[in-house]
């Protein structure tokens, strides 16, 4: 770790403490994040973990080197919701072809949407359908070890059998006993279950549904449960390439560094992942650090279709900033809206609940406009190394304190430290070089305008305002407007100080 970078500390849901991050292997830092189920447009709640863990991915690359970090985010392409959508949207197609159409188109849209939000591509994006062999092998191991059993062509995991063994306890992540979890959970009490808390690893496929050869000697075709998919995919991408997996008896090689997702996944999904992986691989921990982002509300209310406030990422990109109007290339406009959405979300610490508002999105767009305006005026070039981002890096090393990082960016803007501003924005995924260099971006249409002269007039006007000489301040504003330059006054969100920006009009 470079001497100038402080110790990275992350809050671990498993221990309920903020811990110093010590990778298992600093040359192979590994992170897994639960990704989308590709059956519909992703909503803004889905965007939050993508942005949060993209910032962490960038930070890990900054600290340990890009070539030493592996980030896996899965794609769930086997699910009842996918089946239902395929039957609804493509009733005339063979079912497997209909499913393929749903998953391919939805995944393509998801990738385009999250790219517009300024996110890097993960190192790998495994799909569930590509890892059936690993799922079957893991299920067979769990049956052999007595923590899973076959019943009516299903394979089920038994938390009580796990807790009867030496080793990690079921419920450690959620910090609840089996009785407490049963009392607070909605569970499927099927006749073939031995206990109510038992959960499905594999189930038979109904006629016409997609199916694969089953594990554990079951003769009918079937498909995996949700939880085993992530255990198998993380094993395939973060353990087996580094010497771990079902053939490895070394517990340390069968762990990776960080597992992330939304707070809603703590139970049952992540609890069940831990149970499966630890029992199959003989380790105390599936991942050393478990991180979870908080819930999202819209304008102070839970987001739901029934309330009419269900907002997709695509809605934000297309319609979230109507003041942008139509651009010659609307994909570029979408990228600008995506950066504004990213900044808006990062103004709340990832573990806190976030309240999504149209006002904050607009304010974030205005702030980005000011930052990019300075970078453009000073001719900032995309950096090869982030040698001036120490203040932002220090903030992010404190459990991804994005608010403190944004405060550092605001300070850099205030003192016109262009290197610190631009490189700090890059570390947070807020820097798109196109918006710094392109001459045809509508919001920066300032051809034949002397930016330094306007800045001097704005400074002169500010002096008049501070002296309460309103008439002279208004005179400068009106003169600039006659010259086709409109001033806009606002306040610095952090300090409350007056900020004046300008645009070419007419």
UniProtKB/Swiss-Prot annotation:
Protein name from the UniProt record: Cysteine--tRNA ligase
Motif ('KMSKS' region): 302-306
UniProt cross-references to PANTHER family, sorted A to Z: CYSTEINE--TRNA LIGASE, CYTOPLASMIC, CYSTEINYL-TRNA SYNTHETASE
Sites where the protein binds ATP: 305
SUPFAM superfamilies: Anticodon-binding domain of a subclass of class I aminoacyl-tRNA synthetases, Nucleotidylyl transferase
The gene coding this protein: cysS
Top EC category: ligase
Cofactor: Zn(2+)
Motif interval(s): 'HIGH' region: 36-46
Annotated catalysed reactions: tRNA(Cys) + L-cysteine + ATP = L-cysteinyl-tRNA(Cys) + AMP + diphosphate
Cellular localisation: Cytoplasm
Binding-site residues for Zn(2+), renumbered to this chain: 34, 230, 269, 273
GO molecular function terms attached to this record: ATP binding; cysteine-tRNA ligase activity; zinc ion binding
